[in-house]
């Protein structure tokens, strides 16, 4: 998930001596974070360009803010190029922030299908902008797996060209 990438980024920035705070986009308020030296938004896009639930209200707050904060902003979009609205929410966040005059920390970029390599490439660019060596070695946490034993199997519908199987484990 995007939160896993955020945890990797938080850990790497902390190890590089940076002060870091991570929160869901729904909790982000530009006025409350006025003292931040920089802001980094990791934004996933779902379905037809929809925002994740954790981003509720973010665009409204960005659109209502007066000129952008002094802290430069980086937006990294997460999505799947197999969908027509690839990273559309992240692009919208980027566009609204730039329209408000928010300075760019690093150019807008995207990560396709949770690619650790693309994330690491973006991390090197971010590190260069910050003047630090930043190695983002993201290792996704795999879900727990369980071995199942097949007890029985019943097949139906093959003669009607609608095969169905009932499996009992």
Regions found by a protein language model. Name each.
Residues 1-169:
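FNR-like FAD-binding dehydrogenase module
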């Amino acid at each position: 998930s995007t939160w896993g990438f955020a945890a990797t980024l938080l850990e790497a920035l902390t190890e590089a001596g940076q002060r870091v705070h991570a929160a869901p986009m729904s909790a982000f308020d530009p006025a409350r974070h006025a003292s931040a030296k920089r802001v980094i938004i990791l934004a996933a896009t779902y379905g037809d360009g929809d925002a994740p639930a954790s981003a509720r209200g973010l665009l409204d707050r960005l659109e209502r803010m007066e000129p952008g904060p002094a802290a430069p902003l980086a937006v990294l979009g997460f999505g799947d190029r197999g969908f027509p609205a690839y990273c559309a929410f992240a692009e919208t966040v980027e566009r609204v922030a730039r329209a408000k005059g928010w300075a760019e920390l690093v150019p807008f970029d995207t990560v396709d299908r949770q690619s650790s390599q693309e994330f690491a490439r973006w991390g090197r660019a971010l590190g260069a902008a910050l003047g630090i060596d930043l190695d983002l070695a993201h290792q996704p946490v795999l879900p727990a797996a369980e071995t199942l034993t097949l007890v029985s199997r019943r097949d139906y519908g093959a003669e009607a060209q609608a095969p169905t199987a009932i499996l009992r484990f």
